[in-house]
Amino acid sequence: MTKEISLNVNGTPHTLEAKPGETLSTLLRQRLQLTGTKIGCEEAECGACTVLIDGEPVVSCIYPAERAGGKSIVTIEGLAQRVHEEMRLHPLQEAFVEHGAVQCGFCIPGQILTAYALLKRNPDPTKDEVRFALKDTLCRCAGYPAIENAILAAAQALRTGEPLQKP
């Protein structure tokens, strides 16, 4: 039996029928066409499916869609900002590009959203705090030093309002 849910995704309200057994990642990718949320392991092991639910990182591959009712969800698509009718990358997204922290890109949405939640809680993290925050998001291509440096550079830019420091 389906269950009607109302949720807010990237600032847009939606009312949908959640199907039995449907996960949030499936709802986002297949029904709302938000394919930035990746599905890797479907076991909550890799973190590629991470989204923000009410500001906290959650692995969406095991999160029941019906539990998303009444929640505010942010996907990687929701981090980009509209400035004067033009879409711009969030400073975290820009930092990942500038610091070469992207290779295949599969894990990056989950890592960026995890980092975003970290920087909301702690705008000036240490490298160890960044590492700890990323412990549940796996990357097999880019390597963690570039990812950590990108997050620290974005943190500085967000804190100071200055342009992103290039590597």
Per-region residue spans from a language model:
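Signature of N-terminal electron-transfer/Fe-S-associated modules in redox systems
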Residues: 1-167
